[in-house]
Every structure is written in structure tokens, then in C-alpha cells.
Amino acid sequence: MATHPLQSDERGFREPKLSVIPSGSFLMGSHCGQDNERPVHRVHLDSFCLAKTQVTNLDYSVFLAAVSAPPPPFWNDVRFSLPEQPVVGVSWFEALRYCQWLATVTRKIYRLPTEAEWEYAARGNVEGAAFPWGDSAPTAQPRYAHRWLTGPEIVGQSQPNPFGLFEMCENVHEWCGDWFDPDYYLNSPELNPQGPGSGERRASRGGSWRHHIKISRCAARSSIPPSFQYADYGFRVACSL
């Protein structure tokens, strides 16, 4: 697939708004979660940037036009077609291709975040909390209680976490760069873990608009094969410093 660099004022291109995530260490995983969230272990990460919001339909439309690619499934479905809704139906390969295109356009190192980066960023420097706001259940939060949705919401509507990130644990599941291994934490390196070297499924994080409980715990892990295209799967970009 060819790429065609754009100027920032051409055809609606806009570079993602990024939060700088400071270097630091945190306890990754959960003593109270699923087996694949254990053992809880110390991780240290170098500083990186993460997009404040999930990639939107508007952002993705510029990419499609630039590389002459067909749209993903659900593109014309009215439940998912607002410009500022997160793009859905994007496979891991397509999310990676978007990052590669964005890197070409901006001459920066755009990529998908690792699982460790995602969890660290979602926690917002709040050590050990189950959710971005603390440990109280989602059903106790006015935004999340007793809501039925037919699609994802416009990005940037939630209260941002301490790192200035929106919808980190909700709206759509977000692809990560790692392969997925349920036992990876048993031997994960402490410094900048990148995930296993191979696998059959790619890691993802975050909650989903179509679940009864629409927000996930910060430590909750998920995965699907990288070719799958679901209506509650999207992504946000990271950028190396």
C-alpha cells in the first residue's frame, strides 16, 4: 500500500493531540483479577506519548483517502458513522498500517502502545486503583450506571484521567502492539516489556460500548486474532520520544 505524505492543512489532516506520559514504575496486574493478570509485578517504563483520544472516523477517513484503501466494516452504518466517533471494525493490521502512515506523514515514531504502556497510562499514576477514578464500582458512577448504548460515543466526553487521557477504559476495546500470552507475566522483564515474541492473538485493552458493564478495570486483559474486525474494536496511537 503506497503512502502519500500530506501537509497539515491538506484534506482534513490533523496530528493527534498527545499527552506526555512521564517515565516511572508501577505495579502491573491485579491480585483480584483474572489468572492472566497475575502475578502482580513491578514494571519500569521510559517516557512516551499517548493520544488523548481514540482514533476517530474523521482521522481515519484522511488515511483512507491518502492510501486509497477501502473502508472497514460498519463504515456506513449510522450507529458508527459520526466523524468524532472512534473508528471501529479495524483489524490489528489496519491499525498498524495507520500508525505507519502517520509516522511517514509526521516523521515521528507513531505506533501502537504496549500492554504495559496502556495500563500505566490508564492508571494515571494512581498506584493500585482498579479504575481510573479509584476502586468504586462503575455502577456507582453516574456516567456508567444504567445506560444502554447502540454504538460508541463521541470521543473526549469522559472526565480525563490525571494524564489528560479520555475514555481509556471505555467506549471501544483498543489494540495494543503486543502478542498476547496469558502467562507472560510469569517471565515479563521489568524494563519496557514488549510482550512475547510470537503468538496467535494480539493484546487489547479497555471496555466496550456493547457490554453491560461498559468500563473495564485498568489491569483487565483481552485479546483476539489480529485479522478480526469487530464493531467494538478501535485503537489509539502512541509515539516514542
Predicted region positions:
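Short, P/G- and charge-enriched loop/turn segments at secondary-structure junctions
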Residues: 5-8, 35-40, 221-226
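Residue-level detector of short, conserved catalytic/binding motifs and their immediate flanks
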Residues: 41, 48, 163, 202, ...
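Generic detector of low-complexity/intrinsically disordered segments
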Residues: 1-3, 8, 20, 47, ...
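Residues within well-ordered beta-strands of beta-sheet-rich folds
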Residues: 49-51, 101, 236-238
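A short glycine-rich, aromatic-capped structural motif
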Residues: 10-72, 90-93, 169-170, 177, ...
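Short, structured beta-strand segments at or near domain termini in extracellular proteins/domains
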Residues: 231-241
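Functional-site microenvironments in short loops/helix caps that host divalent-cation chemistry
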Residues: 21, 27, 31-32, 70, ...
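Low-complexity, Gly/Pro
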Residues: 1-4, 8, 12-16, 59, ...
